[in-house]
Each structure stands twice: as C-alpha cells, then as structure tokens.
C-alpha cells in the first residue's frame, strides 16, 4: 500500500477545500520533528478524523520515535483535552505496541525522575481520588 500517496491526497484535499466551519485541528504537513516549520505553507486545517488518520499514516511512512509518540498520544488523550474521534481497539493496540518498542531500553535520568515525581499527576488530591476510585464499579451480592 502506498501510504505516501494516501497522505499526500489527504493533505491536497484539505488544502483545496473551503475553510472548515466545524471543529478543526491544525496539522503540520511535514512534522516539526522532521524539519517542518510553523510557516503557513506547512500547516493545514483538518477535521479531527482526518488529523487522526494523518498521524496514523505518518506512523506507517516514518516509523521513528517522535512520529510514533505523536500518534500514540492522539490515541491516549486524557484529562482536559477531549478526543473528537473514537479509537478502534486494534489501532490503539498497534500504537501502544509501537510506542513500547521505541521506549524499551530508554534510561530516565535522576533529574527527570524527580520532575516526574513532583508532577501534578501525583498531587495529594489526585492520589486521594485514585485511591477512592480503585474499586471501580464492583458487583454487589
């Protein structure tokens, strides 16, 4: 399958159409991690679905850590950012597996470990809520 052609066609369609009036996301045509810039010529407005598909295709064309991580993060959105699309379990599993392969063997410095331990996700409020919610919806009886 020619993923580069599919990606180019997706971007060309988005560039040729009228500006979107619905929810839209800005996408770097050439990812910044691969030398792309924030110039107008390198940006395109995509629907949420198109944006997800674009990152899925990019992860097939360029199986490098930063591109895989961007796709994985789109599959794994949590918190205040609401996902405007549904992620199929097979796609999520694929993204998770690729991300895991690239992270394997990564050494985390002591400085980074300290930053992670002090992060907001480990605040007393969050720890208390996590503890209270561990049981989830348990069956009664």
Swiss-Prot record:
Which GO molecular function entries does the Swiss-Prot or TrEMBL record give?
endonuclease activity
UniProt entry keywords in alphabetical sequence: Endonuclease, Hydrolase, Nuclease
Q: Which domain of life is it from?
A: Viruses
UniProt keyword Plastid present: no
**Annotated stretches, region: Disordered:** 115-141
Presence of keyword Cell membrane: no
Compositional bias of kind Polar residues: 122-141
Q: Could you tell me what this protein is called?
A: Probable mobile endonuclease E
Q: Which source organism does the UniProt entry give?
A: Enterobacteria phage T4
The organism that produces this protein has a lineage beginning with:
Viruses, Duplodnaviria, Heunggongvirae, Uroviricota, Caudoviricetes
